[in-house]
Amino acid sequence: MKFLDQAKVYVRSGNGGGGCVSFRREAYVEYGGPDGGDGGKGGDVWVEAVEGLNTLIDYRYKQHFKADTGMHGMGRNRTGSGGEDVVLQVPAGTQLLDEDKEEILADLTEIGQRVLLARGGDGGKGNSHFKTSTNQAPRKTIPGWPGEERWIWLRLKLIADVGLVGLPNAGKSTFLSVVSKANPKIAAYPFTTLYPNLGVVDLGPGSRFIVADIPGLIEGAHEGAGIGDRFLGHIERCASLIHLIDGTQDDVVAAYKTVRGELEAYGDGLPEKQEILALNKIDAMDEAMVAEKRAELEAASGKTVMTLSGVSGDGVKALCGSAWDIVLQNRRAEKAAAEAAEKGEEGWAPS
């Protein structure tokens, strides 16, 4: 399935059905009076986050969504049926923006979360509403109210526990394919990964987390260089980062600083995320070279640097274990915060 993280769609809710002109006609009832029913309400347009989706590709080929019009009222004071709603299904992590992309209308971060995009028009009034002492047979009705229409942008920011970052050819796709059942494209040239890939790492019962392989960043990515600008936003949802560095390149410190610089320039909390720094491709290096480049990275970053090889598998399990420790820590913190907030709401009372 192709990946698409932005789509522009047009939505229109249904018009309300019109009120009815009708008069009671029954045997032995000489003056039946008006009995025109009201029109039905027009259908609404909703957007809902559902399970099993991780792309907006469905909205590349279909961009117009219109709900049904409400049925007109009928005689014997029967109200027309309401128009059928339209529900746009999107992945969790989808943001809704107005047409000029300046205002975020909603952020769907949880499965089942729903937002009303366009409310259907109310139904009109039948002639039974307009009977008076001086007008026993009114022919007046009120038509249904029109629906709403608008253009909106859907923007997906993947929700993952860990984001894989690094320069092109750092070995991120190979690592993801080894630790999960994901099947990203792998080749020995830059920008093999053109779109984010998701994989589930399973370390045992109750020890699973999601990893997002973010396409390779280059210097100037935050300004639109390369392909990194569009996908830096996906890292915002990740609780932590694994920063892979190709150990076979000449200057590993420069590679580290380039990616860190892009994260800091982009902002939005990216520089503050917990980061695991790892020197990759040690299968193509001797022990002395590994030790030398590891020491250079530790001196430049002030962090402990892990070593691994996605090809041979050396160090992969240890790296996943470290990532899981951070994921578990973050989940516990989120749970504690949610419980504290819930407790605070329960304990609130008007003064």
UniProtKB/Swiss-Prot annotation:
Cofactor: Mg(2+)
Entries under CDD domains matching the protein: Obg (cd01898)
Domain OBG-type G: 160-328
Protein name in the entry: GTPase Obg
GO molecular function annotations of the record: GTP binding; GTPase activity; magnesium ion binding
Pfam short name (any one): MMR_HSR1
Family: Belongs to the TRAFAC class OBG-HflX-like GTPase superfamily. OBG GTPase family.
Location of the protein in the cell: Cytoplasm
Quaternary organization: Monomer.
Domain of life: Bacteria
SUPFAM superfamilies: Obg GTP-binding protein N-terminal domain (SSF82051), P-loop containing nucleoside triphosphate hydrolases (SSF52540)
Main subcellular localisation: cytoplasm
Signal peptide segment: none
A GO biological-process term: ribosome biogenesis
